[in-house]
Amino acid sequence: MNVIKGVVAAPNARVAIAIARFNNFINDSLLEGAVDALERIGQVSSENITVVWVPGAYELPLTVKALVESDKYDAVIALGTVIRGGTAHFEYVAGECSSGLSHVAMQSEIPVTFGVLTTESIEQAIERAGTKAGNKGAEAAMTALEMINVLKAIKG
């Protein structure tokens, strides 16, 4: 039986992070977690990490698509936070962001990982950006690293 498992060390990987500026008080922590995981665990040098800031989560799919199509990166990580408010805006932004990133990922030849928080409250977002529930930015980075190696193994 052949078994393919990814490892998270990818010292030569070139990784782009697309991050939303809206809710940056949360997103800064997601970015910190992602960069820490890439450098410390994945052994990716800071010179091989590109961070692209966009206005909000709605702009992430187009930006990620452009990064994928540039052929400069081995993986792209999307980071952002959408917090439910009193209107239907949350559903539109969260749904379109998720759907758009999923579409880009399925059309891509490289890993596209989802580090976008969709929460009911600011407290839930804070918990997922480095306190009680870990750091979803770091998790998205680890997933990107592992998937780089899984896809390399599959392609031979």
From Swiss-Prot:
The active site is at residue 89. One of its GO terms (molecular function) is 6,7-dimethyl-8-ribityllumazine synthase activity. Keywords: Riboflavin biosynthesis, Transferase. (2S)-2-hydroxy-3-oxobutyl phosphate binds at residues 86-87, 128. GO terms for biological process: riboflavin biosynthetic process. InterPro entries: LS, LS/RS, LS/RS_sf. It holds the Pfam family DMRL_synthase. Belongs to the DMRL synthase family. NCBIfam families: lumazine-synth (TIGR00114), PRK00061.1-4 (NF000812). Forms an icosahedral capsid composed of 60 subunits, arranged as a dodecamer of pentamers. This is 6,7-dimethyl-8-ribityllumazine synthase. The gene is ribH.
